[in-house]
């Protein structure tokens, strides 16, 4: 009787789960994917499991220093991992897999502090509990080794982007519009891949929508579409030194948080809420376009992934900003390359788990600024 799955060509080949909960903190995206040496990854299932508002509140509160942090962090990590386990069980059910068919779960965790300049990054997680709940090997803590090697620990997705999205003869940019925007530059002639965080994206857009719509996000960018970009406010937002800093660089809610936004808005109390939303949309678009113009002026095609790919108003703003910056690039989502935009980040962490299992580096030192490429992650056996 033929085997359901052929013997792998490489000992690390097989089926992996990838889990990613980003800076928007609305839930966890998961994928089940088969990696085989010499072949493109094959997605077997995808799932999204949302977070209760109580968990979101706990995670947001941990973004800034506060009382009783160790206890609050530990309890939030356990609650977070129970949602991760639900996502894994859904992937397993949808793909029709037994536990023994899953090589490992690659899980990012939830970033609550990212301070590489001080030598650390903290992703909230309890991988031991996840291994217990799923009875599958878990690979986690992907960022700390890069930071230990002098890097920013972010972004890590560019190595995966280069593997899946690169094309000889065409300079491409992959732009992730999650809570924070970041870009990966894939040179046409096989030069060094580069990548870095550009600035805020959904983190501030969602925050403003929650305040003024009572909803977790601006559905389809409709709130922003009702407004007009306020040029003086946009200039004030872009005055943040991070935007002018050279790569390698990374950022997060440590900088671009509600307190930062409120401080910038203090001198613009007269600006209508919908105009603020339109201006925050422009901030995301302009900050990305300026970086592309500076570091990838020959880009012919830009592909968007992340939650922002579902915001047509943001995509239109990005197209306009690229045009104004003199970048003649087409703009599409990664779906045009065969990978739905909501899958890309989770796929990257499944791939990092695959790389760990093969004992192959997962970072790119040219991206993160680390002393060299390193094997990333730590194993929690089932």
Curated annotation (Swiss-Prot):
CDD domains given in the database record = ASKHA_NBD_ANMK
* Pfam name, any one: AnmK
Q: Would the keyword Nucleotide-binding be found if you checked this record's keyword annotation? A: yes
Q: Which residues bind ATP?
A: 22-29
Enzyme Commission no: 2.7.1.170
Class of the enzyme per the UniProt entry, highest EC level: transferase
- Origin, by domain of life? Bacteria
| Keywords per UniProt | ATP-binding, Carbohydrate metabolism, Kinase, Nucleotide-binding, Transferase
Coiled-coil region list:
none
Q: Name the pathway.
A: Amino-sugar metabolism; 1,6-anhydro-N-acetylmuramate degradation; Cell wall biogenesis; peptidoglycan recycling
* GO biological process terms held by the UniProt record: 1,6-anhydro-N-acetyl-beta-muramic acid catabolic process; amino sugar metabolic process; peptidoglycan turnover
The record's catalysed reaction(s) read:
1,6-anhydro-N-acetyl-beta-muramate + ATP + H2O = N-acetyl-D-muramate 6-phosphate + ADP + H(+)
InterPro entries given for it?
A: Anhydro_N_Ac-Mur_kinase, ATPase_NBD
Q: One GO MF term, please?
A: ATP binding
What is the stated purpose of this protein?
Catalyzes the specific phosphorylation of 1,6-anhydro-N-acetylmuramic acid (anhMurNAc) with the simultaneous cleavage of the 1,6-anhydro ring, generating MurNAc-6-P. Is required for the utilization of anhMurNAc either imported from the medium or derived from its own cell wall murein, and thus plays a role in cell wall recycling.
- Say which family it is in: Belongs to the anhydro-N-acetylmuramic acid kinase family.
In Swiss-Prot or TrEMBL terms, this protein is called Anhydro-N-acetylmuramic acid kinase
Q: Which organism is it from?
A: Burkholderia ambifaria (strain MC40-6)
């Amino acid at each position: 009787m033929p085997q359901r799955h052929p013997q792998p060509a490489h000992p690390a080949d097989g089926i992996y789960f990838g889990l990613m909960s980003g800076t928007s903190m609305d839930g966890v995206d998961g994928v089940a994917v088969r990696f085989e040496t010499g072949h493109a990854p094959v997605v077997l299932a995808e799932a999204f499991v949302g977070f209760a508002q109580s968990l979101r509140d706990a995670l947001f509160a941990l973004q800034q220093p506060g009382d009783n942090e160790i206890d609050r962090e530990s309890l939030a990590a356990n609650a977070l991992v129970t949602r991760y386990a639900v996502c894994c069980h859904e992937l397993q059910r949808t793909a029709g897999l037994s536990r023994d068919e899953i090589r490992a779960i690659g899980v990012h965790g939830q970033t609550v502090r990212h301070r590489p300049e001080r030598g650390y990054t903290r992703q909230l997680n309890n991988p031991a509990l996840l291994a217990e709940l799923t009875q599958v090997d878990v690979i986690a803590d992907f960022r700390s080794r890069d930071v230990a090697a002098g890097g920013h620990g972010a972004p890590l997705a560019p190595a995966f982007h280069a593997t899946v999205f690169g094309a000889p003869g065409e300079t491409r940019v992959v732009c992730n519009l999650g809570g924070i925007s970041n870009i990966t530059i894939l040179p046409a002639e096989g030069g060094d891949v580069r990548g870095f965080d550009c600035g805020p994206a959904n983190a501030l857009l969602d925050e403003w929508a929650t305040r003024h719509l009572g909803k977790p996000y601006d559905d389809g960018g409709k709130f922003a579409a009702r407004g007009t970009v306020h040029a003086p406010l946009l200039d004030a937002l872009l005055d943040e030194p991070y935007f002018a800093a050279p790569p390698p660089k990374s950022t997060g809610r440590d900088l671009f948080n509600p307190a930062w936004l409120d401080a910038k808005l203090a001198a613009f109390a007269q600006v209508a809420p919908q105009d603020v939303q339109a201006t925050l949309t422009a901030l995301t678009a302009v900050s990305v376009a300026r970086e592309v113009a500076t570091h990838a002026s020959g880009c012919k095609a830009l592909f968007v992934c992340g939650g922002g790919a579902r915001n047509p108003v943001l995509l239109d703003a990005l197209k306009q900003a690229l045009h104004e910056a003199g970048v003649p690039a087409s703009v599409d989502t990664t779906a045009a390359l065969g990978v739905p935009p909501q899958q890309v980040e989770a796929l990257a962490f499944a791939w990092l788990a695959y790389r760990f299992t093969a004992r192959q580096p997962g970072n790119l030192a040219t991206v993160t600024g680390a002393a060299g490429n390193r094997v990333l992650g730590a194993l929690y056996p089932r």
